[in-house]
Design a protein with these regions (language model features):
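C-terminal catalytic/motor cores of large multi-domain enzyme assemblies
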Residues: 1-160
């Protein structure tokens, strides 16, 4: 729950709903952060549809004020520009932001019944920026591991 909180008047505010802000780059090198409200009620494909629709509206200047308010956690994707890593600044009052790098194929060593084997796998670097007043390194690392496991065991019907 700490990841989905905010700091208001120096107090931690816990949020029941997950409202994901997603950074969208605009043609003039500016940025806008539309929000997928109540993301916990959608499966991954529903999130993708909603994110795509919001990005199109953002780039065409057709977002409403409600579309850019109320985020509780933010995603940014410098990987879309080819970057392997990105260190994003927290979108306050959120206490965390997840940055996704470009997907690339890499050799990965896996243990098998026959010993170690090398496989080619798609990989992506994740970077979590967080407010150290609320989240420490151990908590942030556990969150990243849970995201990693979710992605490695991906099922498009699962809710977030």
């Amino acid at each position: 729950p700490l990841i989905n909180s905010s700091v208001v008047d120096e107090q931690i505010k816990y949020h029941q709903n997950i409202n994901i802000g997603m950074a969208v780059a605009l043609e003039n090198d500016s940025l806008i952060v539309p929000v997928i409200h109540r993301a916990e009620e959608r499966n991954f494909l529903g999130l993708l549809r909603n994110a795509s629709e919001l990005a199109v509206r953002a780039r065409s200047g057709k977002l409403s004020p409600e579309d850019i308010q109320g985020s509780t956690f933010t995603l940014t994707n410098p990987g879309v520009f080819g970057s392997s890593f990105g260190m994003a600044i927290i979108n306050q009052p959120n206490v965390a932001i997840l940055s996704t790098g470009a997907i690339s194929k890499k050799p990965i060593v896996k243990e098998t019944d026959f010993g170690d084997a090398i496989f080619i796998r798609s990989t992506m670097n994740l970077t979590l920026g967080y407010d150290h007043r609320i989240i420490n390194g151990a908590y942030g690392s556990r969150f990243l591991v849970s995201v990693k496991k979710y992605l490695e065991n991906f099922n498009s019907e699962n809710k977030i």
